[in-house]
Amino acid sequence: MWSFKAELEATCPGSIVEIDCKKLKNGQVYFRRMFVAIKACVDGFLAGCRPYLGVDSTHLTGKYNGQLAAATSIDGHNWMYPVAYGIFYKETKADWTWFWKQLKRAIGTPHGLTIHTDACKGLETAVHNVFQGDVEHRVF
């Protein structure tokens, strides 16, 4: 992961790659969550997409479990446009709040931004706490 972060930041300056780990008393480090927003995707969203984000997550299964969250928009051709993604263990209020803070850091608060999410526990509160009413939040 650290190599991925270093390579992405070197080849795509301005991209945001946040890796959050937990360090135990014995010195072991455990992965908690990750957020990625590639600069070209963020710039494309801000310059040419509707001020709309659809955000949802899906379960990861296999060797590593968790959630893969994605923020997508709609471009000028009405196609899905990827903006950012994150990986975390489960859909908790703390993990969603962390994801939204990283996303806001990446895109700011574009005028007229509408965010669509599902009715996941803690998600509505996290959006409100991070964007503080500056966006319209809809639940589908």
Region locations from a protein language model:
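DNA-binding interface regions
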Residues: 1-140
